[in-house]
Amino acid sequence: MMMPHLSEDLVEEILSRVPAISLKRLRYTCKQWNALFNDQRFSKKHRDKAPKTYLGLTLKDFRIYSMSSNLHGLLHNNNIDLLMEFKGKLSSLNDLNDFEISQIYPCDGLILCSTKRNTRLVVWNPCTGQTRWIKRRNRRMCDTFAFGYDNSKSSCLNNYKILRVCEKIKGQQFEYEIFEFSSNSWRVLDVNPNCIIEGRSVSVKGNSYWFATITKTHYFIRRFDFSSETFQKLPLPFHIFDYNDSRALSAFREEQLSVLHQSFDTEKMDIWVTNKIDETTDWSWSKFFTVRLINRLDYPISMMMKSPLSFFIDEKKNIILCYDKHRENTYKSLVLIVGKDKVYREFYFPESYELGRTYLCNYVPSLVQIKQSGLISTRKRKRKDFSS
């Protein structure tokens, strides 16, 4: 049956309401639909109108995977695979095997990837296939990053920034640099957060968050505001009384932050979620989930280890945790899936050849454009009808 002739505006309006993952499958239906993926105006319209899809990504042995959506089956059927390889490819690479990803930082549908030993940086949109390589000015093995955007502009589209954090003297002296997409350049940032920040950053609504400490019993959240380029101190919904308490941050949906906590002397694990995130430091939290585990979560890390413990909450409120567990005289990556009915199951990955490189995070696909060194052109399209 032939499709009726539809106006360009009507087709665009329909497609702007299709989730990004589904729209990706329709991309090559016709040239006009494919062109929308490179249209900055359409990507903004799509971001405002399309339903969101919340995916769990895991970084395992320098490759990105997506978590299986059949978590109910995983909880009750031992024959279902835990992982399926993430389908997107870095289209600008000739040989993906040469690109070993050691860190990932999702933000606004984009993923900042750092290669093994921090030799290269690339920003990637898995839905559109767009990439942008970021030239490094300084590089150290201990570098970690934060990825966000400037909220002060009327449109944050393409106004992205990367913060480089380098621990020059262990636990005492840090160096900060910031890269702006608009200027295509790095500059030294003269800031001092007056604390030690832990682990990987988490991006929510354009800003980045870490656990931070001044003493080993005084913990809080440190936020980096990419608009003002300053650090801010935010409270936790609980007290950490022991450095060995298990803890992790994660994005919840697109606009909330979640935090996991398990005290050193108990099997009870709590997850809290912010009621909202705004520019103030006056936050409120709600307890989202409590479960009592048979065993404690291991937390065998140094302060700046890049992947100690991570977790993700899916759309059905199942919780997936990942951490490196000491087992049989070595460390193996363990995944713990907890259902909303508090039934849980453990999986061990095949043995990882590098400790601390398994990491889980929340990812929301989008069609957002990556600004290249030059401006992205927004072409004026002629009025025409779409038909099959």
From Swiss-Prot:
<protein>
    <recommendedName>
        <fullName>Putative F-box protein At3g17490</fullName>
    </recommendedName>
</protein>
<dbReference type="InterPro" id="IPR036047">
    <property type="entry name" value="F-box-like_dom_sf"/>
</dbReference>
<dbReference type="InterPro" id="IPR050796">
    <property type="entry name" value="SCF_F-box_component"/>
</dbReference>
<dbReference type="InterPro" id="IPR011043">
    <property type="entry name" value="Gal_Oxase/kelch_b-propeller"/>
</dbReference>
<dbReference type="Pfam" id="PF07734">
    <property type="entry name" value="FBA_1"/>
</dbReference>
<dbReference type="InterPro" id="IPR017451">
    <property type="entry name" value="F-box-assoc_interact_dom"/>
</dbReference>
<dbReference type="InterPro" id="IPR001810">
    <property type="entry name" value="F-box_dom"/>
</dbReference>
<dbReference type="Pfam" id="PF00646">
    <property type="entry name" value="F-box"/>
</dbReference>
<dbReference type="InterPro" id="IPR006527">
    <property type="entry name" value="F-box-assoc_dom_typ1"/>
</dbReference>
<feature type="domain" description="F-box">
    <location>
        <begin position="1"/>
        <end position="46"/>
    </location>
</feature>
